[in-house]
């Protein structure tokens, strides 16, 4: 009998009832909520006369609709209704939360780890597709729909069919200027957006071991972009060091760590599919089309049209086969999102910005993913570096990742973005999104177009 993967071990710990291969009832350790997918679920509870079963295992924050300038000036009627609903609901149902504008407020997938609520071994859900982010800590994390949000509120459980297992091994040492965002974009570009459908993906390898926790979160965050709603990594000393002294970790931290150390994949664990990618062969990535698989290494020509999806993407993006990333005329640069708005991301970007100024006729904004990140960045002077370079320094929120708040890319404009999705109209009606790393986005803001960060000096910040 083969050994177990970390996913097997966590799954087995949380099964309440049901047979493998069929829907199984799973216990939920942590339920994160935000203002967009929770209002209908709360109303469903009221209509049924139910309460939240475990408010102590639930945590809410405001992120999707939050303005990043004049944060209390919410003019969109739907956005304001959703924000007001969450504010009422967390009080009525006695749910721990980070108030809008409070010291801990931010994007839910950043606030969870920052407060220490995200921990190895936990089974985590949220009404948001990028909940796989939390898998970087050795947790099961995945997005759920509003009906499921209500089910978790009422029962602290969820029905799930155990997925197959995909192992992705990142090996080698990256070139200067290549980051974890490039790893995941390269993987998706090579294998497509359907690679992980029906699978949980586990990431291993010396290239993963070398990453910081924040860099690991970037990879797990984008698991959903190739069809896998769950991404997971084995916890290690970096995980434990990150969590130590966080507000919500177990009081007996060392005992918790002793347990967490057992939550790693056995050497003889079975996987249904295995893929290996040598990151030493990777270059900085830039997407040209309208899904994350439509990406190329910097300097590589955009591919020929293979099908109607490609044709539609080229038409929407106003690009042509044979062009390169250098041909893109950028009007906007966005540094932010739950993929790349952590302190380490801002530090990397600042290295390519310090002492320079953004290109004429270009708008560049920096949106830290949480209030603690914003404060930490300001403490070491990153805000001044960006402001002196002509960037806008905003308050935390999901911002320009999606067109649900005032931060939108104008129609027809091309935007270099550190977010996770480049779908049609994602950043605003007619907006043209190019996904890339914080380094590539920062350098592009200065040049007004994409340039090869491998050839650029890095300032000391």
Swiss-Prot record:
* Enzyme Commission number: 4.2.1.33
Instruction: Return the CDD domains for the record.
Output: IPMI (cd01583)
Enzyme superclass (EC): lyase
Q: Which InterPro entries match?
A: 3-IsopropMal_deHydase_lsu (IPR004430), Acnase/IPM_dHydase_lsu_aba_1/3 (IPR015931), Acoase/IPM_deHydtase_lsu_aba (IPR001030), Aconitase_4Fe-4S_BS (IPR018136), Aconitase_4Fe-4S_dom (IPR036008), IPM_dehydratase_rel_enz (IPR050067), IPMI_cat (IPR033941)
Q: Which cofactor does it need?
A: [4Fe-4S] cluster
Kindly list any coiled-coil regions of this protein. Answer: none
Q: What does this protein do?
A: Catalyzes the isomerization between 2-isopropylmalate and 3-isopropylmalate, via the formation of 2-isopropylmaleate.
**Name used for this protein in its record:** 3-isopropylmalate dehydratase large subunit
Q: Which organism is it from?
A: Streptococcus mutans serotype c (strain ATCC 700610 / UA159)
UniProt lineage: Bacteria, Bacillati, Bacillota, Bacilli, Lactobacillales
